[in-house]
Amino acid sequence: MAAAAARWNHVWVGTDTGILKGVNLQRKQAANFTASGQPRREEAVSALCWGAGGETQILVGCADGTVKHFSTEEGRFQGQRQCPGGEGTFRGLAQVDGTLITCVDSGILRVWTDKDKEASSDPVLELRVGPGVCRMRQDPARPHIVATGGKENALKVWDLQGSEEPLFRAKNVRNDWLDLRVPVWDQDIQFLPESQKLVTCTGYHQVRVYDPASPQRRPVLEATYGEYPLTAVTLTPEGNSVIVGNTHGQLAEIDLRQGRLLGCLKGLAGSVRGLQCHPSKPLLASCGLDRVLRIHRIRNPRGLEHKVYLKSQLNCLLLSGRDNWEDEPQEPQEPNKVPSEDTETDELWASLEAAAKRKLPDWEQTQGALQARRRKKKRPGSTSS
């Protein structure tokens, strides 16, 4: 039953307590999955990506340097492998042609054979991409191409099948009006579809577009949003704009053709850690330090669709690309089954709402009685005058 339920989850979220949470938005349920059976902060999930089997497998990068394999078909972990080397947590995770790609804070990018999940053999490739990495991102159209960037670590594009030198190395923007050097802090990266262009968001609230095919290595477009560091960026389904989130829970859509602000989304209360748009539907999934997963509709009518409190601080997410969200079969519940402690529902909030509705008529009756008493008190005074 757990395996069948896991198959239909719409969003997968990695937490600071080492729990992988699967959320079914149609049923308004969230289920917890751990490899050891207990939450452990030393296994905090810092990166997620789909495995070689598409959405039937999830690769879970943990703070202790392990990458776990989770089957969405069976609803359980199927093994793990150690990926040592470098310092810090995983800043990116990807797979291509049976190999696993990892990158950590200290700038060590490694490619591992993924045939034996329990093995801890030496990597088949190691690249030093520079310290202070904030993000490693794979190009969906060319899986052997990855991009890296971080704090005082400018954007670079690497070919894992080519040389150990980057294909593209971004150049910093010109000095500011005081002739002072502009600091570099790339927080997140995305590849634009059907082109070689990339978009980054920075810790200095800038959105920049780079074109490796152009002669210049500086950004071909730059826009700014707000006053706080931008922490995450995702492409909209059309590919002409991006949505960015910052450390104060603000979300905004930026047009990549003109660099102007298209609109904002409300509802978040903490730093944004993960953003992802559905590939075909106008939906945006977001998570962060306020421990709430939110699904926004990004096209008219723009607004909040779903909101799920998940108890732990949320670090990253994966949004299913399925189109048949509403058409999935409702599987029958087993009779007299005690709900699992790992399943979180909105029953409490539903009961509170129902109680509030029951109290509403009593409140109206009380208001009516008070108004009747006031009219009775006013009548003697009005006749005497």
Curated annotation (Swiss-Prot):
Region entry Disordered, spans: 323-385
Top-level lineage group: Eukaryota
Region ranges (Required for nucleolar and nuclear location): 320-385
Annotated Gene Ontology cellular component terms: nucleolus; nucleus; preribosome, large subunit precursor
UniProt entry tagged with the keyword Cell inner membrane: no
Presence of the UniProt keyword Nucleus in the record: yes
Main localization (coarse): nucleus
UniProt-listed InterPro entries: WD40/YVTN_repeat-like_dom_sf, WD40_repeat_dom_sf, WD40_rpt, WDR74/Nsa1
Pfam families reported in the protein's UniProt record: WD40
Cited SUPFAM superfamilies: WD40 repeat-like (SSF50978)
One of the GO biological process terms: ribosomal large subunit biogenesis
Location(s) in or outside the cell: Nucleus, Nucleolus; Nucleus
UniProt keywords, alphabetically: Methylation, Nucleus, Phosphoprotein, Repeat, WD repeat
WD repeats: 40-80, 83-122, 128-168, 179-220, 224-266, 267-306
Phosphoserine: modified positions: S214
N6-methyllysine: residues bearing it: K311
CDD domains: WDR74
Biased composition (Basic residues): 372-385
Function: Regulatory protein of the MTREX-exosome complex involved in the synthesis of the 60S ribosomal subunit. Participates in an early cleavage of the pre-rRNA processing pathway in cooperation with NVL.
Cited PANTHER family: NOP SEVEN ASSOCIATED PROTEIN 1 (PTHR16038), WD REPEAT-CONTAINING PROTEIN 74 (PTHR16038:SF4)
Quaternary structure note: Isoform 1 interacts (through WDR repeats) with NVL; the interaction is independent of RNA or pre-60S ribosome particles. Isoform 2 does not interact with NVL. Interacts with MTREX; the interaction dissociation in a late stage of rRNA synthesis is required for appropriate maturation of pre-60S particles and depends on the ATPase activity of NVL.
Name of the protein: WD repeat-containing protein 74
Organism this protein belongs to: Bos taurus
Gene name, Swiss-Prot/TrEMBL: WDR74
